[in-house]
């Protein structure tokens, strides 16, 4: 089944097959979510079956909206599909653009709407094994240390978010303002 995502071709936003967008390095829309609980952020380790960046740690969830899908609705949908998380209100925090090679000749050139949500202390994830192989909660200090010591364990976009956009994503919620 072909997944059509919003991408710009010759300056016009049109539906493009997701893999084609990555193969051609087309600028396309994306959504990223960070869920926070008690001063920690929920990270996911991408499933080994993912066609790029398998096994790497990423933010809580990230995806591409379907053609015509509202970004906020997309963020809530993917939280449920990837992690079984529902009912967590999401706040739009930032809009950013980045370009990164993600292996196997694929390129993410994303225009991203970033959302933050706050989970109750008793929240439980039900990770979809086709999407996520592990989850963990990390405080700012631990994530800082891991990003510095093992940058290749993390997706390019998480490294970009945390080194270039943390202030705008987290504000005063977490102490993620730093340089690696």
Model-predicted segments: where are they?
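The catalytic Nudix box helix
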Residues: 43, 60-93
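A short, polar/proline- and glycine-enriched secondary-structure boundary/capping micro-motif
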Residues: 25-26, 52-58, 136-139
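A glycine-rich, hydrophobic loop/mini-helix early in the fold
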Residues: 30-64
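A structural signal for short, well-ordered beta-strand segments
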Residues: 33, 61, 92, 113-115
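Acidic, metal-coordinating catalytic segment for phosphate/diphosphate chemistry
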Residues: 1-32
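Nudix hydrolase/Nudix homology domain
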Residues: 19, 96-99, 106-180
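Local beta-strand/beta-hairpin segments that build beta-sheet-rich folds
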Residues: 14, 93-95
